[in-house]
């Protein structure tokens, strides 16, 4: 649904036994053939996008997502001179609601050990994301964006790590863009993640200078200041230089990379800890 100044969308899905691989003995994200997009928001800010990203569970899940986007009227006390954009998002993923069968006594040998009640939420919650993003242009040079994210993350299910507590995290982001002069802009991010589980609290700072339309240089530092083990309260600094041209981005980075799961477009992979140079090329077709 959409009309001037407001728009909304709702997505609901239910999948069961969609683990289609080139080698059926593999697991996690290895050798997947079919693409199963997650019905969750694809966050772009570092802490929300890289610490606890969600990927669809191919063995079965029920997922839903609701988006609401509205723009407050410009030249008003509540909308400001240029108007204010507000985006709300809610996403949820649950296990399947199933009815179990005893295969030994079942005369139908082709029947599975359970039947699925499609689109009904099972007892086990896999993931939940509630977030709001507010964007306001203050003047011709200054734009501010603020975000709040509340996450629930079932680490045992999503990452296959047994004995881990469910993650309950709050994330806040402040993004400030200032145009110094034509084709030159500086952007600063301040991010915080607070949780009592897993590795504890994180902070991230980003500063980026752009020479439009092609070049940019950036510095980012992640700090795991809330880790329960003082030996792991580490900084992860990284500097980057990039060039954009005709839908292609070439970027060279140097710094410390923490271990974890990184997702791009719903495709996730495990990345080991490293310290060194990285060269990446991203193309849009």
Predicted regions and their residues:
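Exposed, low-structure sequence patches enriched in small/polar residues
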Residues: 1-285
């Amino acid at each position: 649904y959409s009309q001037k100044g407001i728009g909304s969308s709702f997505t609901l899905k239910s999948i069961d036994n969609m683990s289609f691989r080139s080698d059926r003995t593999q697991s996690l994200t290895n050798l997947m053939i079919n693409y199963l997009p997650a019905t969750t928001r694809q966050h772009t800010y570092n802490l929300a996008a890289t610490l606890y990203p969600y990927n669809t569970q191919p063995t079965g899940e029920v997922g839903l997502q609701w988006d609401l986007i509205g723009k407050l009227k410009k030249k008003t006390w509540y909308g400001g001179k240029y108007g204010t954009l507000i985006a709300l998002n809610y996403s949820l993923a649950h296990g399947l609601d199933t009815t179990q069968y005893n295969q030994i006594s079942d005369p139908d040998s082709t029947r599975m050990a359970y039947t699925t009640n499609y689109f009904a939420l099972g007892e086990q919650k896999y993931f939940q994301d509630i977030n709001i993003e507010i964007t306001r242009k203050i003047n011709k040079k200054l734009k501010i964006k603020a975000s709040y994210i509340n996450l629930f993350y079932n680490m045992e299910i999503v990452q296959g790590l047994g004995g881990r507590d469910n993650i309950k995290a709050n994330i806040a982001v402040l993004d400030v863009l200032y145009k110094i002069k034509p084709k030159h802009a500086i952007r600063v991010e301040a991010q915080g993640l607070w949780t009592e589980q897993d590795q504890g609290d994180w902070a991230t700072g980003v500063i980026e200078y752009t020479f439009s339309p092609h070049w940019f240089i950036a510095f980012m530092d992640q700090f795991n200041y809330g880790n329960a083990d003082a030996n792991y309260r580490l900084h992860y600094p990284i500097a980057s230089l990039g060039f954009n041209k005709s839908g292609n981005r070439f970027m060279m980075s140097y710094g410390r990379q923490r271990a974890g799961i990184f997702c791009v477009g719903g495709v996730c992979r495990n990345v080991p800890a490293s310290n060194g140079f990285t060269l990446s090329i991203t193309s849009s077709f």
